[in-house]
């Protein structure tokens, strides 16, 4: 048995030294345990690429769990962006600049068509799009969200984003697979549909695959706003 204690400062990763030793010593079995002696940590962004490494400086971890529907949910306080939601290791929303996204998302649809009797939100678990729909005066908002646990932790830790949108009388939450749920919706129901899904290729493909289902429940001259 050989034991090593690697200590590094800043962004230097001790795994580099471990990789060198693995090649030289050629042990059949290696057990490693990592811990941080500092008050902050570095979160490795999954969109890093060869020649470009991107990190978020983490000040505090508020939530880190796997939800009942299988999503890895984290609420982290980032040095630059404040409290932020990560799902499956992808940054979804940060309290510092969220309003720029949500307000633009909703306003873009209203500029094309000002009708706002009702709207459907597909996803948007942080509550920002729902908040904007409420502030713009939509009479009825159907919010189709897969994971209620995401909504709960965002209401707890990112309260400025959602502003308790689920508690508003104009909002109806429909939990579960949104594209299964809308199969039960009548034709031409909504003035606006906002598709605010996770930032991954699977969700982009999912929305594209179901575009005809979304068009079916949209009123003539209605608008669909989606993140692509």
Label the predicted regions.
Residues 26-87:
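Non-catalytic substrate-recognition/targeting regions of SAM-dependent transferases
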Residues 85-88, 195-197:
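Gly-rich Lys/Arg/Thr-decorated short loops/hinges at beta-loop-alpha junctions or inter-strand turns
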Residues 2-46, 70, 93-228:
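The AdoMet/dcAdoMet-binding core of the Class I SAM-like
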Residues 80, 90, 110:
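Residue-level marker of positions within ordered structural domains that often coincide
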């Amino acid at each position: 048995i050989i034991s090593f204690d690697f200590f590094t400062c800043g962004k230097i990763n001790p795994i580099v030294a471990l990789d060198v030793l693995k090649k030289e010593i050629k042990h059949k079995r290696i057990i490693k345990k990592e811990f941080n002696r500092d008050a902050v940590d570095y979160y490795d962004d999954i969109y890093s690429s060869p020649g470009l490494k991107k990190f978020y400086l983490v000040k505090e971890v508020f939530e880190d769990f796997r939800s009942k529907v299988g999503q890895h949910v984290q609420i982290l306080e980032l040095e630059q962006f404040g409290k932020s939601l990560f799902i499956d290791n992808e940054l979804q929303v940060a309290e510092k600049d969220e309003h720029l996204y949500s307000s633009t998302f909703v306003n873009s649809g209203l500029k094309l068509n000002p009708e706002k009797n009702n709207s459907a939100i597909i996803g948007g678990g942080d509550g920002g799009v729902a908040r904007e729909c409420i502030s713009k005066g939509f009479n009825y908002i159907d919010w189709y969200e897969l994971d209620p646990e995401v909504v709960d932790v965002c209401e707890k830790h990112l309260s400025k984003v959602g502003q308790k949108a689920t508690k508003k009388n104009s909002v109806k939450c429909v939990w579960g697979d949104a594209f299964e749920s809308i199969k039960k919706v009548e034709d031409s129901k909504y003035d606006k549909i906002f598709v605010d899904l996770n930032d991954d290729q699977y969700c982009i493909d999912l929305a594209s695959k179901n575009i005809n289902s979304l068009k079916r429940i949209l009123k003539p001259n209605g608008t669909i706003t989606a993140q692509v």
